Amino acid sequence: WGEWHIKSEDGLVPMPDEAIRDEYAADYLAAFPTAKLLMRRPFNIAAKHQLGLYNDMNGEEKDTMEWLGWIAEGGWYGDEPHALSAMPTFWQDAPVGGEFTSSLSMRDMLGKKLPRTLRLLEASHMSFIGPKTASVKYAKGYNAVLKQLGYRLRVTELKLTPCADGVCAELTVANEGAAPFYWEWPVNLYVEDAAGST
C-alpha cells in the first residue's frame, strides 16, 4: 500500500492536486504491473485501475465508518469536490488492507470491544492487517481477528471416480472468508499411500 502524509501544519506544502497525484500513482502502476496496489482513499485513479484500498484506523468506529462512506459514495478530498470515486464493490477485484488504529489500546480493540472490531473488519472485507501486532495476552482476540481476514478456503466435497489412468478426483472448494481469492492459481492435489509416498 502507499500512504501520502503531508504535514501542512509544519509548513509543508499541501497535498498536490489530482493531476500530480495521478503521476505518482502511474509510476507505481508502471513499476509493478502485476501487483495488487492499494491506496488510502478511493481516489479516481484507484477506481480507474481497480486498485485496492487501505484503512489505517481499524478498530476506531467513527474513522472506519467515514472510510467506508468514502468507498460507498466518493466525494470530497480537500478542496476537490470530485476527487474520490464511489467504489462499493472494489473488494471483489482488489484487496483491502489495513492496520489497527493507534488511538485505541489493544486491550480495547481485542478485549472488551472485540465484537465491534470484528464487525468493522467484516464490513471492510479486509484481506490483511499489519504491521501493529498485539501482545500474547490478547491472543484470543487477535486470533478472532485473523479468522475474520481474507479468504478461508475449504474443501466441501471430494468425488473419486474410476478413470483410464486410475482414479479421477473432483474437488468443490468454498470460500468462507470476508474477501475473495484475487488470483487464478492452479490447484494441485497430491495423494499419498500409507507409507507417505505420492
How does the language model describe each region?
Residues 1-134:
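Catalytic-core regions of glycoside hydrolase
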Residues 197-198:
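A beta-strand/beta-hairpin structural motif
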Residues 144-194:
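Surface beta-strand/loop "capping" patches
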